[in-house]
Curated annotation (Swiss-Prot):
Residues 124-188, 189-249, 250-313 form the LIM zinc-binding domain. The modification Cysteine methyl ester is found at residue 830. Residues 432-453, 603-614 have a biased composition (Basic and acidic residues). It is found in: Cell membrane. Keywords: Cell membrane, Developmental protein, Gastrulation, LIM domain, Lipoprotein, Membrane, Metal-binding, Methylation, Prenylation, Repeat, Zinc. GO terms for molecular function: zinc ion binding. InterPro entries: LIM1_prickle (IPR033725), LIM2_prickle (IPR033726), LIM3_prickle (IPR033727), PET_domain (IPR010442), PET_prickle (IPR033723), Pk/Esn/Tes (IPR047120), Znf_LIM (IPR001781). This is Prickle-like protein 1. The gene is prickle1. SMART domains: LIM. It is a peripheral membrane protein. Residues 669-680, 817-833 have a biased composition (Basic residues). A lipid is attached at residue 830 (S-farnesyl cysteine).
């Protein structure tokens, strides 16, 4: 019943039914089918077609009928058997075709026999699928394979194409059944162009297929490709010209055809010439052959920075952090009103300077001139004359129309700024003769000073190549605000970095950073004419592009250069970088390097022998110790005779952030018997070098000395004392780890020589072995004898081979006479063995 329903549905679906009653091989009238197996009864025919897929059943005017016709033409090609269906065979090939067809029919051709297995057969197996065929089921037997070999009706397929053998016609070869097409191909090659068997002796074989010699041609122009280059496209051969005109790809970079001779790179449907110019970064044009790349919006890039459109040529490898950090810090900057260019433009113009060496300013350009300028800035007369007047007021009064031809020729903004302001007020001091004060200088230094004086009349061409000096000035003098940076996250991170470095080794804090020497708590009118050579971190934090703060534009300008060893500049820690890519101003001007043997040529006189020398051990401090701080804070300054001082404080919104760092937790050792001070009060400017208060809490009022006091004291000294002091300066200049500010023969140090009459924490009992308790031994002609700052002697044990040889006892015989020292307060610079 289901079979009848299926037949009715099939008839209604295709809209027709068999009306002919022709006789078939079975001798039965099968009106429904175009073909039925021969020798079967109608019920057996129905059982056979029931085993086949529905689309393969050859119903009249059905899909199965069309499929049968198609398979007849494909599996049994007529041109494989009949000469009349062939196109261009020679007489010899025709004869060979006839012989070939007859041989196949004789040796391999056959038709399958459909039989119903008896119920007694128990072990029949399908040759194709290997499954058991039960008794009473339909099976197909092949006489050429033997009596016991059988297949399921649905498994009787060609061994090559797995298609049902049309009308059960097979060709048996080597134990397998094939359709007529694939059986012929087992014996002879077939032409891929004309689909005929190739009987000729020569043929063309390509891509695993065969062609007649004249049939292997271009699919478009039919040019014979035998022995020539060709390109296969969709199974069809093309000559190079036709392929390029119809199927060649276009390069995404240059837009030209990618020829067959050119290698190409393909990604996501895009094509490039496999060359360094075409397959390269779309932004920086660097070659990407053999390199990973970043695809974005149909283009390829070498990095994420290029994909974002950043100009990599405007920066170097150390500038990537600079760009990101400066963009955040630029919103916190205070710019000068005349500055119309952005901080990023200033940075780029400086980084692109041709002769720039920002790590070592004295190593590029004219190094001799740079050293001469440094030394001339440090001379006493220049410092005395350069800061007698208020600098910024003097600059405003002396400001004249600039020479356009001199500074306007520079594209570099920082060079324009320094040419415009530097030589006219910032770096130009009063041109008074200072040779009278150069008696303490060596011939080599004097020669360099003469060279500096002669170099003041340089032309503009020579100034163009002094970008190293301008860079150093912009870093030291103008501060970070020239690039739009004020204390913020960067400064905080730098302080944290210094804090962490201190925990590792005390070396960073043993050196004398330049920002430790400021007196911002004092008013501007009380500031002396020549400050210490180093500025403070706080004044740098409020400095704008001209070097003046927002509130304190009338602050005097400090000297720009540290008096350090010029030959050892490249071996020092000047390469410390801030977290924004530029030289950290707080690290650049370390004054621990001294100029070697400054007075070694002229200061060879020995002290009078009648003074008994006292061998004093070299003052050494361990690297974990930190420097004691001497600074007048706001609460200390308002007492005594300083209560009437008019202190000008900036508003709270513009004060730089300060952070207190206590290093007591970092390195506490039993022999460190001294008070520690936070970084907030760490300022060792020469103006602040007053004595510390006693443990009882009694505070001293600061004493201030003017230039007249200094000159009186200096001229009242005897030649012996001056010579001894000069030798001390020579001695401390020989060791690079000694603080350079002591050896510096500047007005800053000598002005306050009388400030250290009594310092109860300066020397410990072990270093001060004098038995004299007289109060008059520390004075000469009514003036206190100058004493060195104990905290300034930074000697490490590895730098001095012999403490006794390093410090002659005669030089310290006058400085160790004070015995009013409490034994409970050990010296800050001594190690108790």
């Amino acid at each position: 019943m289901p079979l009848e329903m299926d037949q009715k549905i099939s008839k209604h679906t295709f809209g027709c039914q068999r009306s002919s009653t022709s006789d078939d091989d079975s001798g039965c009238a099968m009106e429904e089918y175009t073909w039925v197996p021969p020798g079967l009864r109608p019920e057996q025919v129905q059982l056979y077609f029931a085993c086949l897929p529905e689309e393969k059943v050859p119903y009249v005017n059905s899909v199965g009928e069309k499929c049968r016709i198609k398979q007849l033409l494909y599996q049994l090609p007529p041109h494989d058997n009949e000469v009349r269906y062939c196109q261009s065979l020679s007489e010899e090939e025709k004869k060979e075709l006839q012989m070939f067809s007859a041989q196949r029919k004789k040796e391999a051709l056959g038709r399958g026999n459909i039989k119903m297995l008896s119920r007694a057969v128990m072990h029949a197996m399908c040759e194709k699928c290997g499954e058991k065929i039960n008794g009473g089921e339909i099976a197909i037997f092949v006489s050429r394979a033997g009596p016991g070999v059988c297949w399921h009706p649905s498994c009787f397929v060609c061994s090559t194409c797995n298609e049902l053998l049309v009308d059960l016609i097979y060709f048996y070869q080597d134990g397998k059944i094939h359709c007529g097409r694939h059986h012929a191909e087992l014996l002879k090659p077939r032409c891929s162009a004309c689909d005929e068997i190739i009987f000729a002796d020569e043929c063309t074989e390509a891509e695993g297929r065969h062609w007649h010699m004249n049939h292997f041609s271009c699919y478009e122009c039919e040019t014979v490709l035998g022995g020539q280059r060709y390109i296969m496209k969709d199974g069809r051969p093309f000559c190079c010209g036709c392929f390029e005109s119809h199927y060649a790809e276009y390069c995404e970079s240059c837009g030209e055809h990618i020829g067959v001779d050119h290698a190409q790179m393909t990604y996501d449907g895009q094509h490039w010439h496999a060359t360094e110019t075409c397959f390269s970064c779309a932004q920086c044009k660097v070659s990407l052959l053999g390199c990973p790349f970043l695809p974005k919006k149909g283009r390829i890039y070498c990095s994420k920075a290029c994909s974002l459109g950043e100009d990599v040529h405007a920066s170097d490898s150390s500038d990537s952090a600079f760009q990101s950090a400066r963009s955040r810090e630029s919103r916190r900057s205070v710019r000068m009103g005349k500055s119309s260019r952005s901080a990023d433009q200033c940075r780029q113009s400086l980084l692109l300077s041709p002769a720039l060496n920002y790590k070592f300013p004295g190593m590029s350009g004219n190094a001799d001139d740079t050293l001469s300028r440094k030394m001339d800035d440090l001379s006493i007369s220049r410092q005395g004359a350069g800061f007698d007047n208020d600098f910024w007021k003097a600059r405003d009064e002396q400001e004249t129309p600039e020479d356009h031809e001199e500074w306007a020729e520079h594209d570099d903004y920082m060079t324009q700024l320094l040419l415009k302001f530097g030589e006219k007020g910032l770096f130009q001091q009063a041109p008074e003769d200072n040779r009278s004060n150069e008696h303490w200088m060596s011939d080599n230094i004097k020669g360099k000073n003469d060279l500096q004086r002669n170099s003041r009349n340089q032309s503009l061409a020579s100034k163009k190549y002094q970008s190293d000096m301008y860079w150093a000035q912009s870093q030291d003098g103008l501060g970070d605000s020239a690039y739009g940076s004020h204390p913020g996250p960067a400064s905080s991170r730098k302080l944290q970095e210094l804090d962490m470095d201190h925990g590792a080794s005390g070396y960073m804090h043993e050196k004398m950073p330049w920002y430790k020497r400021s007196l911002e708590c004092l008013s501007d009118n009380l500031k002396p004419q020549n400050e210490n050579i180093c500025d403070s971190m706080d004044s740098l934090a409020l400095s704008n592009i001209t070097g003046a703060s927002v509130d304190r534009e009338n602050k005097p300008r400090p000297s720009l250069f540290s008096y350090q060893n010029f030959q050892d500049l490249n071996t020092r820690d000047c390469e410390k970088m801030s977290n924004m890519g530029t030289l950290n101003s707080s690290m650049l001007n370390r004054s621990t390097e001294s100029l070697k043997s400054l007075n070694s040529e002229i200061c060879q006189e020995k002290p009078p022998p009648e003074e008994k020398p006292m061998h004093t051990s070299a003052l050494r401090r361990s690297k974990s110790q930190t420097r004691p701080q001497v600074k007048f804070s706001d609460d200390v300054i308002d007492n005594g005779d300083c209560g009437s001082i008019d202190i000008r404080q900036p508003p709270m919104s513009e004060r730089s952030r300060r952070r207190v760092y206590n290093f007591e937790e970092r390195s506490q050792r039993p022999h460190h018997h001294r008070r520690r001070k936070s970084r907030k009060s760490r300022s060792e400017n020469a103006l602040h070098l007053a004595t510390e208060s006693k443990p009882s809490g009694r505070e001293r009022n600061p004493r201030f000395y003017t230039a007249e006091d200094y000159e009186k004291l200096f001229h009242n000294r005897s030649a012996h004392e001056v010579q001894a002091y000069i030798q001390n300066a020579d001695l401390f200049g020989q060791y690079p780890n000694a603080a350079s500010n002591f050896g510096l023969p500047s007005q800053v140090v000598d002005k306050f020589l009388g400030l250290y009459g009594e310092d109860e924490d300066s020397w410990c009992s072990t270093c001060s072995s004098s038995s004299s308790d007289s109060e008059e031994e520390g004075y000469f002609l009514g003036q206190p004898i100058p004493k060195p700052l104990p905290q300034r002697y930074q000697y490490f044990s590895d730098d001095l081979c012999s403490p006794t040889n390093a410090l002659s006892s005669s030089q310290f015989s006058q400085r160790t006479t004070k015995s009013k020292k409490k034994k409970g307060h050990k010296g800050k610079n001594c190690i108790i063995s």
